[in-house]
Amino acid sequence: MTSTHIYYAERTDVESIYEMAIEYKNVDLADANYPDIDRGKLIHFINTMMKKGKIILMRDLDKDKLIGCCMFNKSEYFFSKSEIMQIQIVYIKKDYRNFKLVKTLIDSVKRQADGLPIVLSITSGLGIDPVFEKLGFKNMGSNWRFV
């Protein structure tokens, strides 16, 4: 079993997070017909998430390798001033994926949410709805894209 370490991202982690996002796009989103990654925009997004939200990283201690991340921030419903916690990205590298590691990341978000509703939009097409249902999320609809 892999020994993992969960921690908050720091400025020194930006390049590693960027590389993980590239892998996510190239491996899991390869068939999704998404546009190419713009390095400047993605780096800006990562920095913005570190300023206005949180980035939780997961590292394989045995291999000293970044294996997962979750980016999230407080937001509001578009129709209300009531706050929500919005998960922007939750990702674990393919070889490491299991329910326990996903639960660990989501539990970290729950602790930060302090009772706020947590909203997660899935746009990968990976068919992992049952995992999030098992974690207590309720399916409130679907993401649709016209290409």
Give the residues covered by each predicted segment.
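A conserved beta-turn-beta hairpin within the catalytic core of GNAT-like acetyltransferases
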Residues: 76-87
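A short beta-loop-alpha structural element at the N-terminal edge
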Residues: 3-19
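Conserved GNAT-fold acetyl-CoA-binding loop/helix
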Residues: 25-44
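A short, internal acetyl-CoA/4′-phosphopantetheine-binding micro-motif in the GNAT/acyltransferase core
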Residues: 87-98
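Conserved acyl-CoA
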Residues: 104-117
